[in-house]
Regions:
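Active-site beta->alpha loop and helix N-cap motifs at the rims of alpha/beta catalytic domains
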Residues: 13, 17-135, 139-142, 149-153
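Catalytic cores of alpha/beta
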Residues: 122-134, 179-195
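Short gly/pro/ser/thr-enriched loop/turn and capping motifs at secondary-structure boundaries
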Residues: 117-120, 179-180, 203-208
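Glycine-rich phosphate-binding active-site loops on the catalytic face of alpha/beta enzymes
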Residues: 86, 146, 192-209
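Conserved, mostly hydrophobic/aromatic
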Residues: 86, 142, 193, 216, ...
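Core active-site phosphate/anionic-ligand binding loop and the adjoining beta-turn-alpha structural block
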Residues: 184, 209, 213, 217-220, ...
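Terminal or standalone catalytic/regulatory effector modules within metabolic enzymes
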Residues: 5-25, 255-262, 266, 270-425
Length: 425
């Protein structure tokens, strides 16, 4: 199988689980995400399996109790995840600390992550300070998550050079190709001392994705930085995914090359496709450019937050509403309101005071770590609710910790998946 071929390459890790993968399994594929990671792990015994984890948000769009974070990471490690890439959409270290410590306690590799962005309030020292904090938490490595492809080659060189002076854990780079800079940035970062790069196999690379594995390997061959990866081993893998891509061509975004507007709008690749679909469903595809122009304005109002799940969805949806209503903030979404109230954590800079006062309605904003406000018996309460639902519905569903976690993170679609799991074709 293609998994055995990937396993023979000698990669540092393969990102095969977490976030959108878990969601897609139960929402679209009718596939048990826990079984998926067990199967992948069994077929790739030589390659560490990696997942993306949204810190205190885990895989979802809200904060969970420390108890649930510990439980989820424990079960993820047991089922086959080795490397946990942990980030927070606001770069609030308080939202990453529990997940990092839970990973370490379960003998996983904790990779602390900075969600790279640019703004009037972000500079080199911002990233150095956050990286030092993540190292202090005990992280085994650091990832620079450049989800919108904004890190240019020379800033990348400067950033990695400075980080290598300040921290002593390995540094990884995750950069999307949307702006056309990812490959050049990767090479400059390697020259500055970068330890590892995220790439995609050539047939699934570039545009919304990452630089091609083969391209990066080829560039670094016969240099002081060569990867020791055999290009010939990559060809059958590229061939396999070339066919897979044809099968799902109807679901691809419209971007065919580079979209330089992202350098100013800062919209990540995944967010672009979501916006296109959102506007298409509302017969408003012609408003796409207006929405792209509105996004930086909303982001500024919300404290120059990075655009990565879930903040990318919050900003994107609010921008769409502002444009379609032809009036800014006539309607404020529940999620935008929560962010203004401080319920997601500390924003990089102060949010718009007028908007904040409007949603607070005389109350005080949240200034503590949001998870400190959550009842730590959340897991037991969710388990009781789960048992009650399957009991009343007379459903033959095992009350395993994995199933309870599916229900905890995705109550509606999770239960629908569990009800129909044995009926999938």
């Amino acid at each position: 199988s293609v998994l055995k071929e990937i396993d023979s390459v000698g990669l540092w890790s393969v990102e095969s689980w977490g976030c959108a993968i878990f969601d897609s399994c139960i929402r679209y594929l009718g596939e048990d995400p826990w079984e998926r990671i067990r199967n992948i792990k069994s077929k790739m015994p030589n390659t560490p399996q990696q997942m993306l984890l949204r810190g205190q948000n885990l895989l979802g769009y809200k904060h969970y109790s420390d108890e649930i974070v510990h439980k989820f990471i424990e079960k993820s490690k047991t089922n086959g995840v080795d490397v946990f890439r942990i980030f927070d959409a606001l770069n609030d270290p308080r939202n990453m600390e529990t997940a990092i410590k839970a990973t370490i306690e379960n003998d996983g590799h904790a990779q602390g992550t900075i969600s790279y962005t640019t703004s009037p309030v972000h500079n080199l020292q911002t990233w150095v300070d956050l990286s030092l904090k993540l190292q202090d938490f005990g992280c085994h490595s650091l990832a620079i998550k450049d989800m919108a492809g904004l890190l240019d080659p020379y800033v990348g060189f400067e950033l990695v050079s400075r980080l290598k002076e300040e921290i002593n854990i390995p540094i990884h780079l995750h950069s999307h190709a949307t702006t056309g800079m990812s490959t050049t940035t990767a090479i400059k970062c390697v020259e500055a001392g970068l330890d590892n790069i995220d790439t995609s196999i050539s047939s699934m690379s570039m545009t919304y994705g990452h630089s091609a594995t083969e391209t990066v390997v080829g560039i670094l061959d016969n240099t002081d930085y060569e990867t020791k990866i055999d290009l010939e081993k990559l060809e059958p893998i590229a061939k396999h995914f070339r066919e897979v891509r044809k099968k799902y061509s109807n679901f691809e975004g419209s971007l065919k090359g580079v979209d330089a507007r992202i350098i100013t709008s800062q919209v990540p690749g995944g967010m672009l496709t979501n916006l296109e679909n959102q506007l298409k469903e509302q017969n408003a595809s012609d408003k796409f450019d207006e929405v792209i122009d509105e996004i930086p304005n909303v982001r500024s109002d919300l404290g120059f937050i990075p655009l990565v799940t879930p903040t990318s969805q919050i900003v994107g949806t609010q921008a769409v509403i502002n444009v379609l209503n032809n009036e800014r903030y006539k309607v404020i979404t529940k999620e935008t309101s929560a962010l203004l109230k401080g319920e997601y954590g500390k924003t990089p800079s102060a949010v718009d005071k007028v908007l904040q006062e409007k949603v607070l309605n005389g109350e005080s904003p949240v200034t503590c770590r949001p998870a400190d406000l959550i009842d730590n018996n959340e897991y037991d309460k969710t388990k009781e609710k789960f048992l009650k639902v399957i009991g009343e519905s007379k459903l033959d569903i095992e009350a395993s910790e994995e199933n309870i976690l599916i229900y905890t993170l995705f109550p509606e679609i999770g239960m629908k998946f569990l009800e129909n799991r044995d009926k999938q074709e």
